[in-house]
């Protein structure tokens, strides 16, 4: 095995010391110089004597004359500077393949640029046009006669417009935009100053007499029904997507805010609820009507459980809340009413007491008991056997 390892290492060293002239290792700089001389039309005098000698030794350059090379060698021996030979090339064409005597572009006779008719300096134009595809006497753009710019009708200064339009695709007498007659801006009907509107509209896509937005008649803003100041609303709504008479939010009729039923001021509530997810007639926090704090919503104490608890604490119950009837989970607590403060304990009834539902910490389930017991057993086993 040792002999094999020594043999492998020795072989690697021998290959590394192998001569470089056996064709395996190539001088890249020489190859680059060879390619540059052989495959480019290069002036031999500009390369220097070394490159010329290399070209003579490695092969003839493309497009070179052997007689010229011999002449160059004789001239160099005589100490004279060789003159560069012109490469053999096809007849050079002028910029832009054109008709008779044209310097650039596909044009007709006497055209300096572009596909134009006679006497055109630039662009595809008719006679006497300086630029663009225009009719007679047009300075720029695809226009009708006498147009300075743009695709316009006669006498238009800019844009695709009808007669007498200064800018935009408009009808006669329109200063800007795609509008009807007499419109200053936008795609509008007659007499509209801005936007796509009906007659007499100052802005937006609106019906007659609307100042802004996509609205019905008499709407100041937004996509609304008649007489709505803002938002997508029904008639008489000031804001939001609401039913009639709603000030804000997605609500039913007469709702001021939020997704609510009729008469709800806020939140997702039933009818007549001011806040929270309470039932009907609940003011806040989901409390049942007339119940004190911590009553778990509208859940009333069970009468049977209250009676059983009263029997246990009858002797000690007073005007203060008793402890909760349970140590975990949901229980009940009681206290005397003010008018029953002086009653004897044995005379107390449920009508003499105030009751409340109390919630203690959640009771541990059977899974928790088993897991805790199992954990304790494992700890004891580890302690005993270690």
Curated annotation (Swiss-Prot):
It is found in: Cell membrane; Cytoplasm. It comes from the Eukaryota. GO terms for cellular component: cell surface; cytoplasm; plasma membrane; side of membrane. Sequence repeats lie at residues 96-104, 105-113, 114-122, 123-131, 132-140, 141-149, 150-158, 159-167, 168-176, 177-185, 186-194, 195-203, 204-212, 213-221, 222-230, 231-239, 240-248, 249-257, 258-266, 267-275. Residues 51-304 are annotated as: Disordered. During host cell invasion, proteolytically cleaved at the cell membrane in the region I by a papain-like cysteine protease of parasite origin. Cleavage is triggered by the sporozoite contact with highly sulfated heparan sulfate proteoglycans (HSPGs) present on the host hepatocyte cell surface. Cleavage exposes the TSP type-1 (TSR) domain and is required for productive invasion of host hepatocytes but not for adhesion to the host cell membrane. Cleavage is dispensable for sporozoite development in the oocyst, motility and for traversal of host and vector cells. O-glycosylated; maybe by POFUT2. Residues 293-303 have a biased composition (Low complexity). PROSITE patterns: TSP1. Residues 91-95 are annotated as: Region I. Residues 72-100 have a biased composition (Basic and acidic residues). Residues 312-364 form the TSP type-1 domain. Disulfide bonds join 324-358, 328-363. Keywords: Cell membrane, Cytoplasm, Disulfide bond, Glycoprotein, GPI-anchor, Lipoprotein, Malaria, Membrane, Repeat, Signal, Sporozoite. It is a lipid-anchor; GPI-anchor. Residues 364-386 form a propeptide. Glycans are attached at residue 327. Residues 275-292 have a biased composition (Gly residues). Residues 1-22 form the signal peptide. SMART domains: TSP1. Residues 80-88 are annotated as: Required for the binding to heparan sulfate proteoglycans (HSPGs) on the surface of host hepatocytes. Essential sporozoite protein. In the mosquito vector, required for sporozoite development in the oocyst, migration through the vector hemolymph and entry into the vector salivary glands. In the vertebrate host, required for sporozoite migration through the host dermis and infection of host hepatocytes. Binds to highly sulfated heparan sulfate proteoglycans (HSPGs) on the surface of host hepatocytes. Belongs to the plasmodium circumsporozoite protein family. The N-terminus is involved in the initial binding to heparan sulfate proteoglycans (HSPGs) on the surface of host hepatocytes. The N-terminus masks the TSP type-1 (TSR) domain which maintains the sporozoites in a migratory state, enabling them to complete their journey to the salivary gland in the mosquito vector and then to the host liver. The unmasking of the TSP type-1 (TSR) domain when the sporozoite interacts with the host hepatocyte also protects sporozoites from host antibodies. This is Circumsporozoite protein.
